[in-house]
Each structure stands twice: as structure tokens, then as C-alpha cells.
Regions:
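Activation on terminal intrinsically disordered regulatory regions flanking enzyme cores
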Residues: 104, 108, 172-185
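Acidic loop->beta-strand submotif enriched in PP2C/PPM serine/threonine phosphatases
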Residues: 1-6, 64-67, 99-139, 167-171
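Short, surface-exposed beta-strand-loop junctions and turns on beta-sheet-rich folds
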Residues: 17-18, 86-89, 96-98, 136-137
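Catalytic core of PPM/PP2C metal-dependent serine/threonine phosphatase domains
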Residues: 24-94, 163-172, 178-179
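N-terminal entry segment of metal-dependent catalytic domains or homologous docking segments
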Residues: 1-17, 22, 28-32, 88, ...
């Protein structure tokens, strides 16, 4: 989570493909680099293009990573999502749930990789949720339907449920980020 200006806040999530040290390094590399690129004034799309190219030429082994960027425009009250191989995000508003997903490949697979970009208007009380693929969509939907929970309670409940649903020795990582929107006075 970082600010690029007084009016913009970014949340970035990346999940290295595969397991172990290589996947961890690819996701750390992607988050670190996208943060620095955006903070230096680069757009999300240009930063994605550069990371895609860098993962393709990095070392002899294949390097892939999902890239999930949420840009909150504080004055305009909008959120923009850039998704490249990322799990669905969710917008919870007034008891309803909207999934924000895409079909783009993870960064590093194709020479030309076009991310999915979408934008939504935000309202007071909205809850935005980003997760890694270790959190199943059905679990997120179930937890978010619980009215009255604050962002921390949502993350805690969702994390506990996702851990309980691990089966067959599956040890995929679980990352959950929630942001609740409050109107400025």
C-alpha cells in the first residue's frame, strides 16, 4: 500500500507462479518494481508492460507472476483495477457483491500481455477486497455477505475460513487485503 500523490492511493498484490523461493522472489520483485515505477510517475499500464518484459528476460528459468493493482482516486471517488492473471477482487456495497475479474495472463508469459483494466465509482461504506488465488471465490462471497463487519473483521474471518478449507496438503499462500471507503467531511 502506497501513495503516489496526495489524491492517489495504490494497493498492489502479486503472486509468483509455482511454489518455493522462485515464486516468492518473482512476486517480491514485481511488487517492489511496480511500486517504484508508479511512485516515479509511470502509469499502471506502462509499469505492467515493463514488468512483463523484465520477467520474460530474467534468468534462464521461466518467471511468471500475477499482478493485481488497485488505484484509489481519493478526490474523484473512483477505483481502477489492473489485473494480470490475478484472482477476482470484490466490491461489497449495501448487501450486494460485485466480482471484479479478468482473463489476462500473468506477467512474464507472453511477449505482449494486455492486462484487464476496469473502473468503478465508490460510495461511503463500500468495502474493497483483494485476494490471492489461495482464497476461493465462494469463501469470499460467504464472508462478505456478513453485514456490519469492519475491514479487519472481514480479513480475519476470511483468512480463518480459507485456512480451514485447505485440502490434500495444498499449501498455497493466502493473502487478503481489505479497504473500507469513508466519505470525507
Amino acid at each position: 500500500v502506497f501513495d503516489s500523490s496526495v489524491n492517489e492511493k495504490y494497493i498492489v498484490l502479486s503472486d509468483g507462479m509455482g511454489t518455493g523461493k522462485r515464486a516468492r522472489l518473482d512476486s517480491l520483485f514485481s511488487v517492489s518494481l511496480v511500486t517504484r515505477l508508479i511512485q516515479s510517475g509511470m502509469s499502471m499500464q506502462t509499469a505492467h508492460r515493463l514488468i512483463n518484459s523484465m520477467l520474460r528476460v530474467k534468468g534462464w528459468e521461466e518467471s511468471f507472476a500475477t499482478l493485481d493493482i488497485m488505484r484509489l482516486e481519493l478526490n474523484g471517488g473512483t477505483v481502477q483495477f489492473l489485473k494480470s492473471g490475478a484472482a477476482q477482487s470484490f466490491l461489497f456495497r449495501d448487501g450486494g457483491l460485485k466480482a471484479i475479474g479478468g482473463q489476462a495472463f500473468p506477467a512474464g508469459i507472453l511477449a505482449e500481455c494486455t492486462p484487464d483494466v476496469s473502473e468503478l465509482k465508490l460510495f461511503d461504506g463500500d468495502v474493497l477486497l483483494m485476494t490471492s488465488d489461495g482464497v476461493e471465490d465462494a469463501t469470499a462471497r460467504e464472508i462478505l455477505r456478513c453485514n456490519g463487519m469492519n475491514a479487519q473483521e472481514i480479513v480475519t474471518a476470511l483468512g480463518a475460513k480459507a485456512l480451514a478449507q485447505r485440502t490434500g496438503g495444498r499449501r498455497d499462500d493466502i493473502t487478503i487485503i481489505a479497504a473500507k471507503i469513508f466519505l470525507r467531511d
